[in-house]
Amino acid sequence: MVKFNSSRKSGKSKKTIRKLTAPETVKQNKPQKVFEKCFMRGRYMLSTVLILLGLCALVARAAYVQSINADTLSNEADKRSLRKDEVLSVRGSILDRNGQLLSVSVPMSAIVADPKTMLKENSLADKERIAALAEELGMTENDLVKKIEKNSKSGYLYLARQVELSKANYIRRLKIKGIILETEHRRFYPRVEEAAHVVGYTDIDGNGIEGIEKSFNSLLVGKDGSRTVRKDKRGNIVAHISDEKKYDAQDVTLSIDEKLQSMVYREIKKAVSENNAESGTAVLVDVRTGEVLAMATAPSYNPNNRVGVKSELMRNRAITDTFEPGSTVKPFVVLTALQRGVVKRDEIIDTTSFKLSGKEIVDVAPRAQQTLDEILMNSSNRGVSRLALRMPPSALMETYQNAGLSKPTDLGLIGEQVGILNANRKRWADIERATVAYGYGITATPLQIARAYATLGSFGVYRPLSITKVDPPVIGKRVFSEKITKDIVGILEKVAIKNKRAMVEGYRVGVKTGTARKIENGHYVNKYVAFTAGIAPISDPRYALVVLINDPKAGEYYGGAVSAPVFSNIMGYALRANAIPQDAEAAENTTTKSAKRIVYIGEHKNQKVN
């Protein structure tokens, strides 16, 4: 009987079982290890490739940003961070010759709304603040809300311009989101009506519209500057980028004397009122320099408040309105006749009645014969007509032109007229030659007549006029004989003595009054212009003055009655205010030599008359 060793068998069986149950010795796990190894390697490679591709993309993008599209992207960045702030240039001031302000810019504020921001921030919901804002702007709350809602797509809407700083500061304290305050300026005119026609005015944006404000606008405006900075998201400045220099506006110093200007305006305004006239104008000129010291027109207007002002009130009639100068040109006829040698200084002229082209030459105070002095003292139309007919028309036209008639004054003021002279005409009728000698058939502005008398006052030296201060004085150009011009000035003193109303106490004055009928629609009408033009003091002339009263309707209309007293008041004030030495006492001791009386009938010499 065979016996098996059961214990050995069972031991072998156990050993086999241990080997089978140990995971590290299981044969079927070997392929699994190979798969895991391949997967990990592939994933590593994929990750590496993706990272490399990402790096390449970043490098490419950086290259694109830095080189290909750098400007565009830089601009986009600048839009988000750069801010350009304006550095405002304040409009220059207008000063009188002594530095007194005639026009100045006053700081104000503009109230601006950003409707987009206001609606986005729901600013309109704050009824209390909106109501307070509306009240300060002079609007109802409902109107303000409607205005903002109507412009809901706008980012910039003016609510008010030129608001006083006290109001602006109150509005700023309301802290309404979308309400912006901007600095601006408003023009202020201290002399109001008195210098309105000379200085002019600007619009709400500071652009010159009339007068000096317009003529000298390029000097007065200057140029705004700017400052460019970079800001962070909180609005803090992190870098100063650049500055654009501002060019300050220049002040303009006028030849006008503010004290004289004010006085002249008051006198003209008073004369217009007392004579129930359409208007009045006066121009005062410094004979030595050609500077316009005063130029006033009445009625005037308030440039600080032009609401409802008629455009005709804004005209500077001293330069825009032309008139037939009447007898104010007669001294130049006598001057021309003496210069041309067609009359002797002591000659007696036939001034009896005569007709030309069927029309009688009329004198207000007719006399049979008169000296040159008497022709001007009595303002004889017949006398100057006789003289004019002795000369070619070109002779008188040349004198008028040398005195400045028909020529612009070149003050630079807008709207200036040059008048009518017709100096280049080839054919003249005798009646035209005669009427031109007493100021009909030609036209001039008051400023041109003032320039002509300034030429007489400088004893024949023509100087250009200036509305700005002149330093040093202009030498000028001699256009008339000094001796003959002094004779004419001496005759004008006799005219003043006879008239009396134009005289100034303590001073020797020379004047010529004139009265001319007005033309409407091409026909003479029963309306008149009353002139008085003259110079003072006679011993050493300093000022030339022209006063014009347009269409006086209170009764008298002659220059000697209407404008002569105004001349006296203005000239007297100017002489005393500037401490011009009196010269009337010297005149009392002078003797006037009696002229030889030689009578001429027409062109023929008659016998001497004592």
UniProtKB/Swiss-Prot annotation:
Positions of transmembrane segments: 43-65
Bias (Basic residues): 9-18
Pathway(s) it belongs to: Cell wall biogenesis; peptidoglycan biosynthesis
Single GO molecular function: serine-type D-Ala-D-Ala carboxypeptidase activity
Sequence similarity: Belongs to the transpeptidase family. FtsI subfamily.
Domain of life: Bacteria
Known EC number: 3.4.16.4
Catalytic class of the enzyme: hydrolase
GO cellular component, one term: plasma membrane
Predominant location: membrane
Residues at the catalytic site: S327
Membrane topology summary: Single-pass membrane protein
Coiled-coil residue spans: none
Compartment list: Cell inner membrane
Entry's Gene Ontology BP terms: cell wall organization; division septum assembly; FtsZ-dependent cytokinesis; peptidoglycan biosynthetic process; proteolysis; regulation of cell shape
Chain residue ranges for the region called Disordered: 1-24
Protein name: Peptidoglycan D,D-transpeptidase FtsI
Keywords noted in UniProt: Carboxypeptidase, Cell cycle, Cell division, Cell inner membrane, Cell membrane, Cell shape, Cell wall biogenesis/degradation, Hydrolase, Membrane, Peptidoglycan synthesis, Protease, Septation, Transmembrane, Transmembrane helix
Reaction equation(s) it catalyzes: Preferential cleavage: (Ac)2-L-Lys-D-Ala-|-D-Ala. Also transpeptidation of peptidyl-alanyl moieties that are N-acyl substituents of D-alanine
Function text: Catalyzes cross-linking of the peptidoglycan cell wall at the division septum.
Naturally occurring in which organism (per UniProt): Haemophilus influenzae (strain ATCC 51907 / DSM 11121 / KW20 / Rd)
